[in-house]
A protein has these predicted regions:
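Solvent-exposed helix/loop surface patches that form functional interfaces
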Residues: 22-24, 89-201
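Short, aromatic- and cysteine-enriched interfacial helices/patches
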Residues: 3, 66-68, 137-138, 193
């Protein structure tokens, strides 16, 4: 298992009643490996303030398998205006060190910098970003061909599978997103050793 395997994830939506107007939406999930709970994940979509909407994701993971130890506290913050990403920040605090990623709209392009565990990336993106990995946690990615990966600073390709199932692929990393009634209930992150399962908590 590698550190980016867990950092692939962001959040997932909970089943239940629609939020009241002006209320934040919160989704809580458990993260499992080999049937064992190893962490939690919480995604929040704040109530819109004018044209602005803020999304956040917090993941807290601890894995201890024999000689394999992993600790990750991971936070994503995305700010959208009129449906376009203006600023995305990622902070990861791990037993391998502290890491960060940032994508910021400069009026005619994004400055993108990702400095994560064994992953360093710089880019300029001129196309407005309107869909990110975090957005997948608040509804099916119907009609979306790709999602901006906040952690990596580039994109996952999205494709639809049978039923309300979607596949995300980037550089050999694969995940399956499963929806029920438009709500994301499970993510299966494929891993050569053990898959990571993220499940909606009751």
């Amino acid at each position: 298992m590698k550190l980016p395997a867990l950092l692939f994830f962001s959040a997932l939506p909970a089943l239940g009643q629609a939020p009241k107007p002006g209320a934040a939406e919160t989704r809580r999930y458990g993260i499992e490996v080999a049937g064992l709970r190893v962490g939690t994940m919480t995604a929040t979509r704040q109530a819109p303030v004018g044209p602005d909407v803020v999304y956040s994701l917090v993941s807290d993971v601890k894995v201890n398998f024999l000689f394999y130890h992993l600790k990750i506290y991971y936070q994503v913050n995305n700010r959208f205006r009129n449906g376009q990403l203006l600023l995305s920040t990622v902070e990861a605090h791990t037993n391998q060190g502290d890491f960060a990623s940032r994508a910021e709209w400069k009026g005619d392009h994004y400055d993108i910098a990702a400095d994560q565990y064994k992953h360093h990336y710089r880019a300029i993106e001129t196309q407005p970003i309107r869909y990110t990995v975090t957005n997948t946690f608040f509804g099916e990615p119907a009609g979306q061909a790709r999602a901006f990966a906040e952690y990596f600073g580039d994109y996952f390709a999205l494709s639809r599978g049978p039923g309300a199932t979607y596949h995300a692929l980037r550089d050999g990393r694969e995940a399956e997103y499963q929806y029920t009634n438009g709500q994301l209930v499970t993510i299966i992150k494929k891993n050569p050793l053990k898959n990571f399962i993220i499940r909606l908590l009751p």
